[in-house]
Amino acid sequence: MKQNDTKKTTQRRNSKKYSSKTNRGTKRAPRDQEVGTGAQESTRNDVAWYARYPHILEEATRLPFAYPIGQYYDTGYSVASATEWSKYVDTSLTIPGVMCVNFTPTPGESYNKNSPINIAAQNVYTYVRHMNSGHANYEQADLMMYLLAMDSLYIFHSYVRKILAISKLYTPVNKYFPRALLVALGVDPEDVFANQAQWEYFVNMVAYRAGAFAAPASMTYYERHAWMSNGLYVDQDVTRAQIYMFKPTMLWKYENLGTTGTKLVPLMMPKAGDNRKLVDFQVLFNNLVSTMLGDEDFGIMSGDVFKAFGADGLVKLLAVDSTTMTLPTYDPLILAQIHSARAVGAPILETSTLTGFPGRQWQITQNPDVNNGAIIFHPSFGYDGQDHEELSFRAMCSNMILNLPGEAHSAEMIIEATRLATMFQVKAVPAGDTSKPVLYLPNGFGTEVVNDYTMISVDKATPHDLTIHTFFNNILVPNAKENYVANLELLNNIIQFDWAPQLYLTYGIAQESFGPFAQLNDWTILTGETLARMHEVCVTSMFDVPQMGFNK
């Protein structure tokens, strides 16, 4: 496999058609009728002008709209000298078909006891202890760490379930099904095709082992992340539409260090094109769950949660069988959510990288002796200091354009569309140390952050192969001709998705930027402070449990 125009895999021809469904949409508000009495609306182009001979018209316009996407086409020339014309015009046509939004689940930004996750920790601890007698040998932060660790188990189950469900989808009008989708999820398609029964067994064993622990179903935090990891979404309600989906970049592994309390550390998931097999996913799951199974406090907290919420109030994971499939859905608000996403880059895992920025590593921590035991997650985002990577953040230091379909937007529509948005408020480097990367501090984020995007298209050089592109919200077009062409080609592919993330283009030595590249509909300008308040409301809601002193 090759990445960024080097990762490839052989395509598979599909033979079964999938059905797409609409589960909801947005109604456009009535047009304003308050016009003057002399106003006249523009009229339509009347087809009757051309249809005096309807039978001949029908024969002349009979065209086959059946070209599958996921295939290479040469549109050819209609000039006298095709040889001469080919020097200037590339008539090859490839339509990209898959865009994957790679995300990391988070508890929201938290740097003291007043953050939403710490208020939620107090609420759930109060409720669980109210429903249980006796002395607890764990603190409220430990209980919240337990609940966050359970989220990663549920995401992993949804992730591998989607792999299995996608492997059974075929359609003659979209050659990206199912192979390209599996490649985007980091799995070896041939391994899934050849070992269906083993994959079904593994997915069910993940559900069974995760079901050994209790987590409250009232926390929609779990539902949100399971939904992200399960679904497929199309950019138009047609059979040849392009596909969007979500994939976890990393999950959180539970660790109990004793003296400093429990914490969650990163466990990286496969990237697009990694070609991981079933055995690799088995190792990942064992790594994720091993520290939970051997921890006494984890078992005690599970029992207390079970007693507090009851068997009917717990998260349940469904089994899979040979008929399990995931069908694509068209939903304008989900597309608006992807369109408003802003990528923060890969997690910073090396502690040495963060010298001069204490406490900003990608870990969810708590220490009873520090900050009154508050759960802390206040990471820095950044790259290795190269210009083209640093520029990916510059556009996100400004206020963002919130662009929505339709008109008359409700609070529910706005809050859903902003779930993947992140803004940055300051650029920082360690004093006097130019060798360190440029780091950016967030101005608030929600229950997940987008790390980057993966797009898959047909490779022009070898049309039976696929090309994997990884990109962010900024595209740099430098002076070098080869990079200039490659980045413009990438931009051309991205904007073929109707609701691709908004992009900014930076070019030349002066590093001037312009954008966004987007088809603006009904839009407004959103500030970092307003976005931070939205995220705070959402995190508070998604960790909801019965509360003693608040009347909703």
Swiss-Prot record:
Query: InterPro entries of this UniProt entry?
Result: CP_picobirnavirus, CP_picobirnavirus_sf
Q: Which Pfam families match?
A: PBV_CP
Q: Which cellular components does GO assign to this protein?
A: T=3 icosahedral viral capsid
Q: Does the keyword Acetylation apply?
A: yes
Cysteine disulfide links? none
Q: Where is this site: Cleavage?
A: 65-66
Chain spans, region Disordered = 1-41
Question: What domain of life does the native source organism fall in?
Answer: Viruses
- Describe its PTM? The 7 kDa polypeptide is acetylated. Autocatalytic proteolysis releases a post-translationally modified peptide that remains associated with nucleic acid within the virion. This peptide is observed only when nucleic acid is packaged in the capsid.
Keywords annotated in UniProt? Acetylation, Capsid protein, T=3 icosahedral capsid protein, Virion
Basic residues composition-biased segments: 9-28
Q: Does the keyword Acetylation apply?
A: yes
Instruction: Briefly state the protein's biological role.
Output: The capsid protein self-assembles to form an icosahedral capsid with a T=2 symmetry made of 120 subunits.
The UniProt subunit note reads as follows: Homodimer.
Q: What else is known?
A: Picobirnavirus particles are capable of disrupting biological membranes in vitro.
Name listed for the protein in its UniProt record: Capsid protein precursor
* Gene name per UniProt: Segment-1
